[in-house]
Amino acid sequence: MTITTQTDARKLRARLKHPIIDADGHWAEFAPDMRAEFRRIGGDTAVEALDMASARIPNSLRMSVAERRRRRIGQEAFWFLPTKNTLDRATAMMPRLLYERLDDLGLDFCVIYPTAGLGYYRLPPEKHRRALCRAYNVFTAEQFRPYGDRIIPAAIIPMYSPEEAIEELEFASKQLGLRVVMMGSLIRRPIPALVEDHPEAAKFVEWYDPIAIDSEHDYEPVWQKLRELRIAPSFHNGARSILLRNSPSNFCYNHIGHFASASEAMAKAIFLGGVTRRYPELNFAFLEGGAGWACSLYADLIGHWEKRKLDALENTKPANLDRTGLLALAEKYAKPEVVDAIRRGEGLDDNGDGTGGVEDLDDYSRCKIASKKDFEDLYVKRFYFGCEADDPINAWAFNRKANPMGARLNAFFSSDIGHFDVPDMTEVVPEAYELVEHGLLDDDDFRDFMFTNAVRFWGEVNPDFFKGTVVEKQAAEVLAKPR
């Protein structure tokens, strides 16, 4: 097989004055090797856990459409890894080949996330979940350790409880030397009322815990541990085959928008839960969902604050209704039946005078918003958004005219190499550059998208993150400059 080295990606990279960091590539873990290594690392428990986690999608695909419809099980991805492009398939499987091809792909540095392991943090039995994540983290660290100057893998952090998260953070950071983490979130939990009143049904209906707001667990120690370890958390959660993305016959129906949906839930919880207010030392990344949802959420959070902050609630407070004035208007403009109802005080408090038992009426109280400027500090500066190369909506993040207060959101390049939506790994960097060629980004925007924002995401939290890498000097120059 001939390996082409004079790729368009290599040529484009040679013209640029800055490195390129891929903030979210994927490798395709080779199951037979992984199984053998898991047994060595974690024994029978790790292998049992691997078998449990690996069975879900194949079991679903073995069902007929009719059976999935009967059970309301979503259609999963079939044929999701490269096959026709054999070189890319091998590149996704073999870390050394990826390392050797980075220049051909136009990449200086790459952060690698799981494929099979993306959902390992969800495995329900605690014993197996923790063994599975531990074995995976050891396995991945060993696989990529020789290539650390250009490739860093992400550790999987289970989050069903703060205790298991802290233990794995400590191990991954201090024992394995990993400095990228993929945090579990949208944790499936039983509904207490069903457990108490209908225990036979409780296992079939769950709620999704975004951990940063209204959780039954206190995750404050997790944020504290991330700050202590100087680790910027990333979230690569999906919402496929649940709720409104649960077609039993159409994978694309389930797949489109599911990363954005999950990311929005997490970002909204972290913001409204006040995490960015309490931990300004941390940055947070939401991967593979693009930036369109992030721009929309940013504007919507501001819009809701303007209408629902405490002083704005005076506009809808039931006690502020001038009933005498309303009656006078009704007597002039309404039919007699309406006048009589208003005179009796009927129909004027659609929801009564209740507030649902909420003592603090300010939904933004945890993040202590005093002015619109706070949204820049707590949202714009703290959140980062992984965007694939072929998404033209990436340009929205950099559009100061479209975003409130002239904001540029922190979109960064996330290639998704190794998955079905990248048929040729050598094309992702040129594809990203099309935003410049089409006039949607300028050169400064492209530099920030492909390099600067990734440096700031990890480097602001851990200034030593890029030490020993091929981009150490350029990253240090970025971090030495004020925003």
Predicted regions and their residues:
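Mid-to-C-terminal alpha-helical segments outside catalytic/metal-binding sites
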Residues: 2-19, 29-109, 138-146, 167-171, ...
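Divalent metal-dependent hydrolysis catalytic cores, especially in the metallo-beta-lactamase
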Residues: 20, 81-90, 100-123, 150-156, ...
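Short glycine-enriched loops at secondary-structure junctions
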Residues: 115-116, 237-242, 417-420
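Residue-level preference for long, well-ordered alpha-helices that form the structural scaffold
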Residues: 87, 91, 125-136, 161, ...
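Residue-level marker for buried hydrophobic side chains located in beta-strands
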Residues: 19-21, 233, 411-413
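Catalytic pocket-lining loop regions of alpha/beta-barrel enzymes
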Residues: 3, 131, 144-152, 157, ...
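Active-site loop-helix segments enriched in His/Asp/Glu that coordinate
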Residues: 104-106, 115-145, 149, 162-173, ...
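Short glycine/proline-rich turn/loop motifs
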Residues: 73-87, 117-123, 203-204, 251-256
